[in-house]
């Protein structure tokens, strides 16, 4: 008799219980006492694994560390206080004891575990899009909402422009003008031909940046161009879905030769925003801010409501109708996703 196939929830519970068991086992095996540890020192998390993290000290040396049980979360980019062990235990060299307050963080929503932090202390988010299979302004808008809410400067990068004919390129430049008009910086590049790669490298030298974007847009190819020694695995775009295969398994922080840091994180196929409410989404559209609060009614939905200042600004040509429509599609998808998520948890 064939075994009954496990449901997705059952599979997740089994995996979760297995991970917790392994976690408890590891903690029992490695118990650090004060006598086994050196003085406290500063460090930065450069890679986070399930129960360990790689920490870089002020001299640029990297050590694999355990986490104190009191630490609730730890992500790449976190500035930490840690102690080096007098000797290695099972390949582990020390313990992370505290996390400094974060300047900012970006998170992605997890349908079962709530918000899952990805990285912290970021100066710039590089939103990577590609011309194939199609340019999605909706995906760009989702990332821009995240940037605005987190207070992190975005850079919109359009990769693989070498695949465009001149007429196609002009059409895409026209599409992207709505972002330039409201102050967003755009860079059209090609990791293959090298177009504008020097400009991207110069921008990356200004602090800590993170690449975000769907799989298959060329993030790994860009990293290989910027940091050839890293040799990030490149994934092909699926012919059926138009999406690339996930090629990065753990987020990691790299130091760039010209200065600055780059965080590479696993591709996110759908950057969900269901953890945000409509008011937060609205604040994620920077060009809306000067009219917010001036509508006739406080509960204005910015649709056909009488006296809607936002809609009037669109009609007067002060706000792009493309961005206005994108905003409402995002609000609608937010409601649909929340109801689906609620249903899946019942």
Swiss-Prot record:
Q: Does the keyword Isomerase apply?
A: no
* Sequence positions that bind Zn(2+): 295, 300, 302, 308
Instruction: Specify the CP-type G domain's residue ranges.
Output: 103-271
Q: How is the cofactor bound?
A: Binds 1 zinc ion per subunit.
Keywords from UniProt, A to Z, are:
Cytoplasm, GTP-binding, Hydrolase, Metal-binding, Nucleotide-binding, Ribosome biogenesis, RNA-binding, rRNA-binding, Zinc
Record's subcellular location: Cytoplasm
Name the residue ranges with Polar residues bias: 7-20
Region (Disordered) residue spans = 1-26
Locate the residues binding GTP.
Answer: 159-162, 213-221
Q: A GO term (biological process) for this protein?
A: ribosomal small subunit biogenesis
Supply the EC number(s). 3.6.1.-
Task: Report the main location listed first in the record.
Answer: cytoplasm
The UniProt entry, under SUPFAM superfamilies, shows:
P-loop containing nucleoside triphosphate hydrolases
Q: Which CDD domains match?
A: YjeQ_EngC
Q: Which family does it belong to?
A: Belongs to the TRAFAC class YlqF/YawG GTPase family. RsgA subfamily.
What does the function comment of this entry state? One of several proteins that assist in the late maturation steps of the functional core of the 30S ribosomal subunit. Helps release RbfA from mature subunits. May play a role in the assembly of ribosomal proteins into the subunit. Circularly permuted GTPase that catalyzes slow GTP hydrolysis, GTPase activity is stimulated by the 30S ribosomal subunit.
* Subunit structure as annotated in this protein's UniProt entry: Monomer. Associates with 30S ribosomal subunit, binds 16S rRNA.
Q: What is this protein called?
A: Small ribosomal subunit biogenesis GTPase RsgA
Instruction: Name the source organism.
Output: Haemophilus influenzae (strain 86-028NP)
**Mind giving the lineage of the organism this protein is from?**
Bacteria, Pseudomonadati, Pseudomonadota, Gammaproteobacteria, Pasteurellales
Report the gene name.
rsgA
């Amino acid at each position: 008799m064939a075994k009954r196939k496990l449901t997705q929830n059952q599979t997740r519970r089994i995996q979760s219980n297995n991970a917790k068991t392994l976690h408890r086992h590891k903690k029992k095996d490695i118990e650090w006492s004060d006598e086994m540890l050196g003085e406290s020192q500063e460090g930065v998390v450069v890679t986070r694994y399930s129960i360990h993290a790689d920490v870089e000290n002020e001299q640029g040396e990297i050590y694999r560390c355990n986490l104190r049980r009191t630490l609730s979360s730890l992500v790449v980019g976190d500035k930490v206080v840690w102690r080096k062990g007098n000797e290695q235990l099972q390949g582990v060299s020390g313990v992370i004891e505290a996390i400094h307050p974060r300047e900012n963080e970006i998170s992605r929503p997890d349908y079962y575990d709530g918000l899952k932090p990805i990285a912290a202390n970021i100066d710039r988010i590089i939103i990577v899009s590609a011309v194939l299979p199609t340019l999605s302004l909706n995906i760009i808008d989702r990332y821009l909402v995240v940037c605005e809410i987190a207070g992190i400067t975005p850079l919109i990068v359009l990769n693989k422009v070498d695949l465009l004919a001149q007429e196609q390129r002009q059409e895409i430049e026209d599409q992207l003008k709505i972002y330039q008009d409201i102050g967003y910086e755009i860079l059209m590049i090609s990791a293959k031909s090298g177009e504008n790669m020097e400009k991207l490298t110069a921008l990356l030298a200004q602090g800590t940046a993170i690449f975000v974007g769907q799989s298959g847009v060329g993030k790994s190819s860009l990293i290989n161009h910027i940091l050839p020694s890293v040799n990030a695995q490149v994934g092909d775009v699926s012919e059926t879905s138009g999406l690339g295969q996930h090629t990065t398994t753990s987020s990691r922080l790299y130091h760039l030769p010209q200065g600055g840091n780059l965080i590479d994180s696993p591709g996110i196929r759908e950057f969900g925003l269901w953890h945000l409410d409509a008011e937060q989404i609205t604040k994620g559209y920077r060009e809306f801010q000067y009219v917010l609060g001036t509508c006739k009614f406080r509960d204005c939905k910015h649709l056909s409501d009488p006296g809607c200042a936002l809609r009037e600004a669109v009609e007067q040509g002060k706000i792009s109708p493309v961005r206005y429509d994108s905003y409402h599609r995002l609000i609608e998808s937010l409601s649909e996703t929340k109801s689906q998520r609620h249903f899946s948890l019942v």
